[in-house]
Amino acid sequence: MASNDPKNGGGFFASLASSITNFGSAMSKSVNGLMGYEGLEVINPEGSTDDAEEEAGRGRWKQEERDGYWKMMQKYIGSDVTSMVTLPVIIFEPMTMLQKMAELMEYSYLLDMADKTEDPYMRMVYASSWAISVYYAYQRTWKPFNPILGETYEMTNHNGINFIAEQVCHHPPMSAGHAENEHFAYDCTSKLKTKFLGNSIDVYPVGRTRVTLKRDGVVLDLVPPLTKVHNLIFGRTWVDSPGEMVMTNLTTGDKVVLYFQPCGWFGSGRYEVDGYVYNSAEEPKMLMTGKWNESLSYQPCDAEGEPLPGTELKEVWKVAEAPKNDKYQYTHFAHKINSFDTAPKKLLSSDSRLRPDRYALEMGDMSKSGFEKSSLEDRQRAEKKSREEKGQKFAPKWFDETEEVTPTPWGDLEVYQFNGKYSVHRATAENSEDTTDVKLTQFNPWQFQDLSA
């Protein structure tokens, strides 16, 4: 059946298609060849082309640092720089990519509501709002640490959830995550892919995210848009995620398509998200609108995408108040993720909280953080050498690689699945009488050689 897509007519969001089409022109606020640097693009999200050159002199780097980083990074233009470049800790935040995965759990109550409701379209409203909610945290411009192979992150004491993530592959960097409470199970395999463009970088979310709602066994599949990080070296760094997010109910065929508007002149369209919940016949049933850094609302609509008479917009999600003037723009939940308040009893020694480089950066000691980061990277190379000399192969503890290779808009993905061993481990740990202070545990993700010293 052909899609009755209101974007093609005069519906409530008739301008969406042209906004996406004009993405290229909206992003033309740039200066190419600035100061003799060929291919340099600087974009001021709050201005126009007239002040792009002025914008180039802003940002976190001094002029000599900008020049040095530009010369160093030029050779990588067009490349995937996910793990091939050693970067200074000054651009890092005290968090790893595994912890970043856990930030998706902040508003997990929306998945609880999706499981509880009997309305199939409200189910999609709640679930897609959960998927949107993390973008407020994702706008941070600091780089998280790449996890060490075998590194983990555990989280408890939040909405009844047990969360576990593990770095399952080093080249290419791949992470797997699982979270569960009485209402839902979340499973994710992530293999980020990047393209360095000089003063910006495209981040492609190669991955598979599935949520199972336990009451009816409904399975939801999520495909997010790419993310673009602007002004990496010249100008103030900022993040945009233009494009569409699609969440599909694999059980019923219902779906949500939400459009992230690209940032236009003087910030127009920035943060805006609009779209519809469709039934399996691709007929719009609910319109959704809002800003991913503020709130989302919904309203029942007709077949043309227009609001039904007698209905009104209702807010479904609102961003929680964040700390003022936080150095890393952390939310209260991000601080909670970094703390031991969310750590379970008998925390795994491979947990991200225990990384000495991450902790040193959190304490404000960049020199020590840089030293510890280099030390961990050296030990990781030593373990790899030891493993290869012995003819041994790394195997994740809490996830198993399957034979499934799933296509994504940005490339194929090898799928890892939760093997259930962590649930057994956690039950045993919770029944243990061990009262060891987890903060005193030494970080040790190594499997093949005692490299913790």
From Swiss-Prot:
In terms of Gene3D superfamilies, this protein maps to: 2.40.160.120, 3.30.70.3490
Protein's name according to its UniProt entry:
Oxysterol-binding protein-related protein 3A
Q: Which UniProt keywords apply?
A: Endoplasmic reticulum, Fertilization, Golgi apparatus, Lipid transport, Lipid-binding, Steroid-binding, Transport
- Look up the record and give one Gene Ontology term from the biological process aspect: double fertilization forming a zygote and endosperm
Renumbered to this chain, region (Disordered) spans: 370-405
Q: Which organism is it from?
A: Arabidopsis thaliana
Role, per record: Oxysterol-binding protein that may be involved in the transport of sterols between the ER and the Golgi. Binds beta-sitosterol. Required for ovule fertilization.
Question: Where does the record locate the signal sequence feature?
Answer: none
Compartments annotated for it: namely: Endoplasmic reticulum; Golgi apparatus
Gene Ontology CC terms, in alphabetical order: endoplasmic reticulum; Golgi apparatus; plasma membrane
- The UniProt annotation puts the region (Required for binding to PVA12 and location in the ER) at 398-403
Residue spans of biased composition, Basic and acidic residues class: 370-392
The consequence of inactivating this gene is: Unfertilized ovules, but normal pollen tube attraction.
**Annotated segments matching region Required for oxysterol binding:** 166-175
InterPro entries with a match to the protein in the record: OSBP_sf, Oxysterol-bd, Oxysterol-bd_CS
User: So what family is this one in?
Assistant: Belongs to the OSBP family.
